[in-house]
A protein has these predicted regions:
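Hydrophobic alpha-helical transmembrane segments in multi-pass membrane proteins
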Residues: 103, 124, 137, 141, ...
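Hydrophobic alpha-helical signal-anchor/transmembrane segments
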Residues: 1-70, 171-233
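A short hydrophobic/aromatic micro-motif that marks alpha-helical segments and, especially, helix-coil
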Residues: 96-99, 150, 167-170, 198, ...
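Juxtamembrane/interface alpha-helical elements of multi-pass membrane proteins
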Residues: 42-130, 140-148, 155-157
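Short, surface-exposed helix/turn micro-motifs that flank interaction/cofactor sites
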Residues: 89-90, 161, 181
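Hydrophobic residues in alpha-helical segments
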Residues: 30, 79, 117-118, 150, ...
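Hydrophobic alpha-helical transmembrane segments
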Residues: 125-145, 160-178
Length: 233
């Protein structure tokens, strides 16, 4: 699976259609006061679909990273208990099944990796291939550290344990930061709707004043500039 891509479901397409149609109607009414602008619906639809895919990729990678961090804890614990890395990874498959059920990105990855290992692929090779596909810095870093520790021998289990601890510390810190700024993000999203509310209020309460912005070239240019500035904000 390529985690830099997101396959939209029928539900996603339905949401995109509703959002893009609503946005097109709002643009036609508030910015141009002309139903002819509705012909721009395909452009708005493509733009909304692009945003949906980007958000889908972000959520997908966020979910994968969370599940991978839990796999690391299981892997480290199993190796400390005396399992080989291959057997520890097989045990991790069972743990992920219990934790997430079949609705798990990492479970399918672990199952495929275990199949590859049974076909005499090395764990380092399958881990490296997965890390490359994930596109996540934490997974790539762990893969590199794992390969280095495996080649160098010595305190292999200790290296994996300390690496897991450091990565979890970083992960927890990032989660706390996300929680701290989530209120600001919500506030920003709310602020994004204020220009639309103001424009709606002016159009409903001062139609004569706003009419100067519609039906002429200067008004079209001005409103188009405002729309582009709003879309880019």
């Amino acid at each position: 699976m390529d985690y830099s891509r997101y396959s939209m479901s029928a539900k996603d397409w339905g949401i995109v259609f509703i959002k893009s149609m609503s946005a097109t109607v709002i643009i036609a009414y508030l910015f141009y006061d002309s139903p002819i602008v509705v012909i721009a619906f395909p452009v708005v639809f493509v733009y909304c679909a692009k945003l949906c895919r980007q958000e889908g990729v972000r959520r997908q990678k966020e979910k994968l990273n969370e599940e991978f961090m839990n796999v690391l804890k299981v892997l480290s614990s199993n190796m400390l208990a005396g399992y080989s890395v291959e057997n520890a990874w097989q045990e991790a498959e069972k743990e992920m099944q219990l934790m997430y059920g079949n609705d798990s990105l990492m479970l399918s990855e672990i199952q495929e990796m275990n199949r590859q290992i049974k076909l005499n692929q090395t764990f380092e090779a399958v881990l490296s291939e997965f890390a490359y596909r994930s596109g996540l810095e934490d997974i790539v870093n762990f893969s590199d550290i794992f390969s280095f520790a495996k080649r160098s021998g010595g305190r292999f289990v200790d290296i994996i344990e300390s690496t897991t601890y450091r990565m979890w510390t970083k992960y927890d810190t990032n989660r706390q930061i996300d929680v701290a700024v989530s209120a600001k993000r919500l506030e920003q999203k709310t602020m994004n709707y204020i220009p639309i509310f103001l424009l709606t209020f002016l159009k409903l309460s001062s139609r004569d004043y706003m009419s100067a912005l519609y039906g002429n070239l200067i008004g079209v240019i001005f409103m188009s500039t405002c729309l582009l500035a709003y879309a880019g904000a």
